[in-house]
């Protein structure tokens, strides 16, 4: 596949002390020399894995970094159905961070909007307000009607392991799928890619749990 290399700048190209030209020239040099296929990000003299990078700062040139999250998923080659030449359809997705005080009515409003998948940002290793029976019931109902429910960790260096605490196990039993050590950006992009390719919920869940391009395996 043709490599995709993304770059940009923290200051406009015409501003004094801009990093735009250094990033652009550096990115072109990387392309000229050749690098691993796939999506990469070049910023501040660093070549970063596109499926692992996050923006951590808004006030410095080293704004992007790869987070060393635990990634232990089984790797699988990208199937033809998910190839970059395949057309994609629009997908209705949502992201919701869990927080103390989250009400079931908030979740109901989101699910009633017709989302096909919901990415929940859970506490730590994959816990949340699991003592809220109404909220859990809403998740179970959404899962039963075909909504793909996935969970990432809110921690910058975390991963979702539902079996560590009872609270996490209850979320898993309500239908949530662990994103393992994927970042929010990677998990969201993966959901867009899987569902946008026309895969059904069950098939999308199967591929979501596998590592396809280094997003969830070292």
Regions found by a protein language model. Name each.
Residues 1-103, 108-121, 125-218:
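Active-site histidine-anchored catalytic micro-motif
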